[in-house]
Amino acid sequence: MKAGHKTIDKSYMHVSLIFYSIIIFMNMPDFIIFETPMEYKPVLYFQRKLVDLRNNDKIDDTFIFLEHNDVYTAGVHYRGNDDIIRVERGGYETYHGPGQLVVYFIINLRERKMNALDLIKKIQNSVVNTLKYYNIESYPMLNEKTGVWHEDRKICSIGIAIRGFSTFHGMALNVNTDLSKFNRIMPCNFSPDIMTSMERISGRPFNINSVRERLIQSIEKEFDIKEKNIYKNVDLVGYGNGLLP
């Protein structure tokens, strides 16, 4: 070695690179996709578990994409006495079922320097941009009409809840939804005929997997997500307990 030259500790660089890679990996959000319709309650318990993990920095932001089997739920404003499943989200009654694309957002608002309204607007923008790709004009609404609308019909419902600094629940986009299922309730405190779907507007069914992929792209852009982990059909019990999906 010539005088004045310094040696480089390559082992230190190697360890540092590994550590840096781990940090980058851990800060990548998780996109969880369920490819068959899911029962509602197990997924509700799953969300609650993920919120606790997110608040304790055990997981990163998580986006859950799925369809549900037929179910009716009601948010904190509902005052009825029937057997509808009560949940923590805002809003009134709604229906979930096959043909409806649901996304749950487990987001740490503090880390993203956002508030609840910021999140709702990002969800709305993601949906509007997705529908625009399919030549469906839509617009966001807030307050008692929170969601995304086409003309005078509601195509996407939005309702979130916050525990600690993290959110759960999210949005439901009617793709090929059987709209007659809304007839037994007052969806979002409106008449059942207020609801519409991509299929009804366009006069044809859509491939819900393709719509999901387009929505994922819109969400990535809106939330400035450059990289992500994708997991499919995860174990609702094992996920987040130190087990890889």
UniProtKB/Swiss-Prot annotation:
Domain BPL/LPL catalytic as annotated: residue spans: 38-227
GO cellular component: cytoplasm
Pfam family, one: LplA-B_cat
UniProt keywords, alphabetically: Acyltransferase, Cytoplasm, Transferase
CDD domains (UniProt xref): LipB (cd16444)
Organism the protein comes from: Picrophilus torridus (strain ATCC 700027 / DSM 9790 / JCM 10055 / NBRC 100828 / KAW 2/3)
Keyword Acyltransferase tagged: yes
Pathway per the UniProt entry: Protein modification; protein lipoylation via endogenous pathway; protein N(6)-(lipoyl)lysine from octanoyl-[acyl-carrier-protein]: step 1/2
Biological processes per GO annotation: protein modification process
Family (UniProt): Belongs to the LipB family.
Site (Lowers pKa of active site Cys): 154
Transmembrane segment boundaries: none
Xref: HAMAP family: LipB (MF_00013)
GO molecular function: lipoyl(octanoyl) transferase activity
Gene3D superfamilies the UniProt entry points to: Bira Bifunctional Protein, Domain 2 (3.30.930.10)
EC number: 2.3.1.181
Name of the protein in its database record: Probable octanoyltransferase 2
Further remarks about this protein from its record: In the reaction, the free carboxyl group of octanoic acid is attached via an amide linkage to the epsilon-amino group of a specific lysine residue of lipoyl domains of lipoate-dependent enzymes.
Active site: 188 (acyl-thioester intermediate)
InterPro entries assigned to the protein according to its UniProt record, in alphabetical order: aa-tRNA-synth_II/BPL/LPL, BPL_LPL_catalytic, Octanoyltransferase, Octanoyltransferase_CS
Compartment list: Cytoplasm
